[in-house]
């Protein structure tokens, strides 16, 4: 840029920042802390042009405890536009007076009258093009509304007591089209409490019902072109809404009517339909704290496996597919984290521009970052109107997209290699309101300089590389104690599922338990998160302890071979398949494992184990339960001794000989008795004669 032109731009910017005002009024309002909010609800035209009349409508709400009288709304706009993004950012950083000149011509402002505490009034201002007094140069004009009023002391300041700002582009035809798109995040706003139920069931139901935040956001998103939208889905939201419908994890005493369940079902069906329309990006279940996982590599693998299982199970249940994506917190990105998240290289990571200090809009919103493990895509979020006064609305979103696109296409005129675009991601907590249709968001994608583009199509194109540094993370991740408790859930759950033949439902439920305590949300209440994780770990261990094994206190064999009983008890609610393995204190003796057997829920089974001591006299055995994959699980039985009597054979021989002697004696005695009887019968009788 030439020096004279630079001086002109600086002078114009200074003029904007100076803000022309009406002289002769006090510099500051008597009320030092006016508390009013302003929302722009409609703005036409969406693109400025000669001959058009700028019409802006919206609402102003008084949050003060006193009334404001003689309230008026004025349109404000500067004489010259911004032509680069850096000009916009500099102006915003320098304060909120950058909007421009207040239009005070008769008939261009709105008299609202008095505004009582907590009262909301609508405003409408109309200013013909000629009365805007603008230069007509191409660029982006900040345009807004300023609210003036008289306080309870009767004093009226020339300073606005409230304001709202958006942007209005003026771009002629013939410019290059740039990619324009919106990312719509749908996150689970609720969490499970200490007892396993959702802590705010009524709040979740309100969000997904008609007029609720998530319902309004979905309706707005569904109204946009498939080519210009990308759904960012948290599977925990799908599961949570489905739980509402089925009455699962609902606190005792909370009863949902059939109509309420129908509202939740409609939301779930509509969200799935929207996500399937253009393909979606899918977060890990409950948006996990990936920084905490990366900082604890010894725990990362089992925890990540559980999160993946919970995610996959939800996607399978709801027949949804999408590209895996990670979303760290705003200031929770490091180069090592990106390395760990790289995976196969096709899973994007969402980061803010603050995480990439050397990033510039000319690189585009989707860039390639090279890690030691290979390249990966990053989606960089950078909101044009961050920090401007006023509440977010559909109109400000529309104007943000149009203005980003206008600045991008103007940049390409002087920088043909620029990849600047107009991709934006809305705040997942934003409520566009039930009157979202009045904002006409679709107009953002009808401009001659915008090209509706999905993020999936962006990833199929060559990406520019970001070779700069990654900022240091300042966010505090979840504690190691919380991760260790989650790892104990994994360990106990893995052991339990290994003995359940049909364990998919059990595995999925345990995976959800793990994922539910690893979300970024727990950073705000780490103590509660850790306590819940420990409780879930204890419950998983308690369930495993319901499967027990009992052995006799001691066993004495009459020979080197014999058997002894082992009893397995299953007090869980699931049928199990489990075997038995033995540890012997005598290294020369090995007891064969008992093959797995099926035991029904609430049943017990006693089996006989055969043993051959061979030449050994005794051994101490410890019985362990064994899963079908050969791993020992649960607590072993108490150790017991098995002995073999060395005189066993002698005893049997002696007993045999004794029996023979007894038998011989009986035979001999019987024979003698028979002979005496025979002799007596053969002797002649004595003759008396």
Predicted regions and their residues:
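Secretory targeting and sorting signals
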Residues: 2-29, 657-668
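Asparagine-centered strand-capping/turn motif at beta-strand->loop junctions
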Residues: 59-67, 567-572
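Short aromatic-acidic-glycine turn motif
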Residues: 76-100, 153, 584-594, 629-632
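Intrinsically disordered, low-complexity Pro/Gly/Ser/Thr-rich segments with frequent PxxP/GP/PP motifs
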Residues: 94-134, 590-616
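Short glycine/proline/serine/threonine-rich loop/turn segments at secondary-structure transition edges
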Residues: 131-143, 615-622
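Active-site beta->alpha N-cap acidic-glycine motif
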Residues: 157-160, 164-274
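Catalytic grooves of carbohydrate-active enzymes
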Residues: 221-225, 229, 309, 313-321, ...
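Membrane-proximal extracellular "stem/stalk" segments
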Residues: 513-516, 523-648
């Amino acid at each position: 840029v030439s020096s004279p032109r630079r001086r002109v731009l600086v002078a114009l910017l200074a003029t904007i920042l100076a803000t022309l005002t009406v002289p002769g009024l006090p510099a500051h309002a008597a009320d030092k802390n006016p508390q009013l909010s302003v929302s722009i609800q409609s703005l036409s035209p969406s693109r400025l042009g000669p001959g058009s009349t700028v019409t802006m409508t919206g609402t102003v709400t008084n949050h003060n405890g006193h009334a404001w009288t003689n309230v008026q709304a004025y349109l404000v706009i500067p004489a010259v536009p911004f032509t680069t993004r850096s000009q916009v950012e500099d102006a915003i950083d320098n304060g909120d007076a950058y909007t421009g000149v207040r239009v005070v011509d008769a008939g261009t402002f709105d008299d609202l009258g008095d505004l009582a505490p907590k009262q909301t009034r609508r405003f409408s201002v109309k200013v013909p093009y000629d009365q805007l007094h603008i230069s007509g140069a191409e660029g982006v004009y900040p345009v807004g509304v300023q609210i003036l009023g008289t306080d309870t002391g009767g004093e009226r300041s020339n300073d606005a007591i409230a304001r709202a700002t958006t942007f209005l582009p003026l771009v002629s035809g013939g410019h290059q089209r740039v990619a324009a798109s919106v990312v719509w995040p749908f996150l689970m706003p609720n969490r499970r409490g200490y007892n396993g139920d959702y802590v705010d069931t009524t709040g979740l139901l309100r969000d997904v019902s008609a007029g609720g935040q998530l319902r309004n956001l979905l309706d707005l998103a569904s109204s946009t072109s498939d080519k210009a939208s990308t759904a960012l889905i948290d599977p925990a939201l799908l599961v949570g809404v489905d739980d509402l419908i089925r009455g699962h994890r609902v606190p005792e005493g909370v009863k949902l009517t059939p109509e309420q369940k129908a509202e939740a079902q409609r939301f779930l069906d509509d969200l799935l339909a929207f996500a399937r329309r253009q393909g979606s990006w899918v977060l890990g279940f409950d948006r996990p704290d990936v920084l905490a996982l990366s900082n604890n590599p010894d725990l990362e693998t089992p925890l990540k496996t559980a999160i993946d299982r919970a995610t996959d199970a939800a996607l399978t249940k709801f027949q949804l597919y999408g590209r895996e994506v990670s979303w760290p917190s705003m200031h929770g990105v490091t180069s090592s984290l990106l390395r760990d998240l790289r995976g196969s290289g096709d899973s994007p990571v969402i980061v803010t521009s603050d995480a990439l200090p050397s990033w510039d809009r000319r690189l585009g919103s989707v860039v390639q970052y090279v890690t030691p493990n290979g390249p990966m895509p990053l989606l960089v979020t950078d909101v044009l109107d961050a920090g401007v006064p006023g509440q977010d609305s559909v109109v400000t979103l529309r104007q943000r997209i149009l203005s980003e696109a206008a600045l991008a296409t103007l940049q390409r005129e002087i920088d043909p290699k620029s990849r600047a675009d107009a991709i934006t991601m809305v705040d997942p907590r934003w409520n566009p309101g039930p009157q979202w249709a009045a904002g006409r968001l679709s107009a953002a994608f009808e401009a001659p300089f915008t090209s509706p583009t999905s993020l999936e199509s962006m990833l199929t194109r060559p990406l520019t590389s970001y070779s700069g540094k990654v900022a240091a993370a300042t966010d505090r991740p979840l504690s190691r104690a919380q991760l260790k408790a989650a790892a104990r859930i994994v360990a106990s759950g893995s052991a339990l599922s290994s003995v359940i033949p049909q364990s998919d439902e059990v595995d999925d439920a345990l995976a959800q338990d793990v994922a539910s305590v690893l979300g970024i949300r727990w950073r705000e209440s780490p103590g509660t998160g850790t306590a819940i994780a420990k409780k879930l770990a204890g419950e998983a261990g308690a369930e495993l302890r319901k499967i027990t094994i009992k052995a006799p206190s001691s066993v004495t064999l009459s020979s080197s071979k014999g058997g002894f009983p082992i009893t397995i008890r299953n007090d869980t609610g699931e049928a199990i398949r489990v075997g038995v393995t033995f540890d012997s204190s005598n290294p020369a003796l090995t007891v064969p494992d008992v093959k797995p057997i099926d035991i029904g829920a609430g049943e017990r089974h006693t089996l006989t184990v055969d043993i051959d001591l061979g030449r050994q006299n005794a051994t101490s055995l410890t019985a362990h339960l064994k899963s079908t994959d050969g791993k020992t699980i649960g607590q072993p039985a108490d150790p017991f001794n098995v002995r073999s009597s060395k005189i066993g054979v002698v005893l049997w021989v002696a007993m045999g000989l004794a029996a023979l002697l007894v038998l011989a004696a009986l035979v001999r005695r019987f024979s003698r008795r028979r002979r005496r009887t025979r002799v007596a019968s053969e002797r002649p009788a004595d003759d008396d004669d």
